């Protein structure tokens, strides 16, 4: 048994995802950290909590147990694509109102739940963003076909609540958009975004913890699709990132109010970057492997540092040093690495009524010529990481 002192740290997650790699690793790291620091620790599942207002005061019960000593810091992992403001966010607001320090805070999570909400928060801060349109309501996709034409074709079409690269399409023309409007699911609105051609099938994932860049990973598609997500078969390797890229990721994290986040950057021909997405519930199984890091351990260290008596550990304080040192040995991202693939073209084929099961057929493919930059890059990454 670990000794207990006044400081309390909780790990709050959702039953639907608690057995996934990131949650299991964070739980392991938090337990180890709390034993090392002799901190009182508890892991809690969202649906175990009962929120109360009694005699004008906020209260909390867990499986019938009245909680009298509240946590000072709560590490939160909730499935952001399905976050419900009337349930999940209500719990997080309740804990925050009781004086708990949440990482991430509920407003920060909401900033990343909807991709267009993310852009709304980032707009006006000088953050480079691809031009993006969206709409109110659920049935206005077809109406947007003409409105979004100024973005030019091909254009990117995304579900505002999509995740892991799903429900993302590259529409070649207005007719393709019209076809999509009849096939996609309309539970959430879609956004229409200017296509960054030179970053097709490639992006940079940056993980930021406590306002510091933990590491950076170049992700590359292996089959010509636009998305480079490792969950869709993409591969990744540790890479260096320019100071401009690092500062951009930190700026995005700060604007969104994030303690832990993953920022996806698209690469431009001139070596600069623009923001693609921000992830409040960032996965890191491929990131850990590619960058030889223990992201969960870094998260646990930062959580402990937020306690009243906490301080940044050596692992956290050395992050920037490690990041700088890696640039001497890892491939650099710059204008040469960002050379555009000029001969991309869109294609379509007959599809079933469910786009998520036939997404592959709707995606733009790179032509099967003798020279396919992304395929070569992906093969090199595989050789380096295997």
Curated annotation (Swiss-Prot):
Ligand binding (Mg(2+) 2): 277, 279
Which positions in this protein are listed as binding ATP?
158, 193-203, 219
Record's subcellular location = Cytoplasm
Q: List the Pfam families hit by this protein, alphabetically.
A: RimK (PF08443)
Q: Which domain of life is it from?
A: Eukaryota
Boundaries of each ATP-grasp domain copy? 119-304
Q: Where does Mn(2+) 1 bind?
A: 264, 277
Provide one Gene Ontology biological process annotation: protein modification process
Family to which this protein belongs: Belongs to the RimK family.
Cofactor descriptive note: Binds 2 magnesium or manganese ions per subunit.
Organism field: Bos taurus (Bovine)
List all membrane-crossing ranges.
Answer: none
Query: In its UniProt entry, what is this protein called?
Result: Beta-citrylglutamate synthase B
**Binding of Mg(2+) 1: at which residues?**
264, 277
Any idea which positions bind Mn(2+) 2? 277, 279
Which sequence ranges form a coiled-coil region, renumbered to this chain?
A: none
């Amino acid at each position: 048994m670990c000794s207990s002192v006044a400081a309390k740290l909780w790990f709050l997650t959702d039953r639907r995802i608690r057995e996934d790699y990131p949650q299991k690793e964070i739980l392991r790291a938090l337990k180890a950290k709390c034993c090392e620091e002799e901190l009182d620790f508890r892991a809690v599942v969202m649906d175990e909590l009962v929120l109360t207002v009694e005699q004008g005061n906020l209260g909390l019960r867990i499986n019938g147990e009245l909680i009298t000593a509240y946590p000072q810091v709560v590490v939160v992992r909730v499935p952001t694509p399905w976050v419900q403001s009337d349930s999940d966010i209500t719990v997080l607001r309740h804990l925050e109102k009781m004086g708990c320090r949440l990482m991430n805070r509920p407003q920060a999570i909401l900033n990343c739940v909807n991709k267009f909400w993310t852009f709304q928060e980032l707009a006006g801060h000088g953050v480079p963003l691809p031009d993006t349109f969206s709409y109110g309501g659920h049935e206005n996709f077809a109406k947007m076909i003409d409105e979004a034409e100024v973005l030019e074709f091909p254009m990117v079409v995304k579900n505002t609540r999509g995740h892991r690269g799903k429900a993302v399409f590259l529409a070649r023309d207005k007719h393709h958009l019209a076809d999509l409007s009849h096939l996609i699911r309309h539970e959430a609105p879609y956004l229409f975004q200017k296509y960054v051609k030179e970053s097709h099938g490639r992006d940079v994932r940056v993980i930021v913890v406590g306002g510091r860049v933990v590491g950076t990973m170049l992700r590359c598609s292996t089959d010509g699709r636009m998305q480079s997500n490792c969950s869709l078969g993409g591969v990744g390797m540790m890479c260096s990132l320019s100071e401009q890229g690092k500062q951009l990721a930190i700026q995005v994290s700060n604007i969104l109010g994030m303690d832990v986040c993953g920022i996806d950057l698209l690469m431009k021909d001139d070596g600069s970057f623009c923001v693609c997405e921000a992830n409040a519930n960032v996965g890191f199984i491929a990131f850990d492997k590619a960058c030889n890091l223990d992201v969960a351990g870094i998260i646990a260290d930062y959580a402990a540092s937020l306690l009243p008596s906490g301080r940044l550990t050596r692992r956290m304080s050395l992050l920037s040093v490690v990041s700088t040192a890696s640039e001497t040995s890892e491939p650099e991202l710059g204008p040469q690495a960002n050379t555009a693939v000029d001969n991309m073209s869109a294609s379509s084929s007959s599809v079933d009524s469910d786009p998520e099961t036939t997404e592959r057929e709707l995606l733009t493919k790179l032509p099967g010529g003798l020279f396919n930059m992304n395929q070569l890059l992906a093969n090199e990454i595989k050789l380096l990481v295997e």
